[in-house]
Amino acid sequence: SASQIKGPTIQEYDQEGVVAPYNIDSVAKSEGWDNLLDPMIAAIHKCENNSGPYCAAPVNIHRIDWMWANKAVFDNNGISVPTSWDELNAAAEKLQAAGIIPFAHGGQAWQDATVFEAVAMGIGGNNYYKNCYVDLKENCLRSDTTVKVFDQMRKLQGFTDEGSPGRDWNVATGMVIEGKAGFQIMGDWAKGEFTAAGKVPGVD
C-alpha cells in the first residue's frame, strides 16, 4: 500500500516503524535521484534521520511565493507587472487611488506567513532568510534588512481591504479573477482557481 503525506511527516512514520521496507531506494539509486534532486528535497525523502536510504518519492513540490494578477485591471490602469517591491507599491497606490482593492489577502496566520516569506526572500535573498528564520541569528534578526522586510509588510497591509481578516485564500483569489482586486501573493495552487474560471495565463 502507499500513501501521500507531507515530506517531514515521513520521518515520524519511520520512527514509529510503520514505513514499509525501503524498496524504493533501489529505484532511487538506479535513476540517480541524488544527482537529480536538490539536497534538501532528497533528504526529506530519506529515512533514518534524513540520511539513510530513500523511503519515499516526491510526487509534487509546491512553491508559495507567486504573485497572481488580473491583467485587465493592470492594463486598464496603465500598470505593467511589477518586478520590484517599489514597482509593486507604486502599482498598488495607483489602484487604490482608482478605487480598486490592490492586494487581495486573507488575514489568516498561514496566509500571513506565506506573504512574509515572499517578502523576506524578495528583499533579503536566500542567505538572509536562512540566517534569520532558519538559524535565528540575532545579528540578522536585528539588521536593517529585517526593518525593510517589516516595513514592506506594513505597506502591504495598507493595500488590503476591511474584509481581509479571516478570509479564505480561494475567496481572495476569486477577487483577483473577478477584477475586484489587482493581485494576490499565494502559492502555485491558486492556478487551479484561475483554470477553473477559464482564465488564460498572459491573457487574463
Label each region the model flagged:
Residues 1-3, 99-102, 178-186:
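Alpha-to-beta junction loops
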Residues 64, 72, 76-77, 151, ...:
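Extracytoplasmic/periplasmic substrate-recognition and gating elements
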Residues 85-89, 164-177:
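Short helix-initiation/N-cap motifs at beta->coil->alpha
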Residues 92-95, 134-166, 204:
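Glycine-centered hinge/linker elements that transmit conformational signals in sensory
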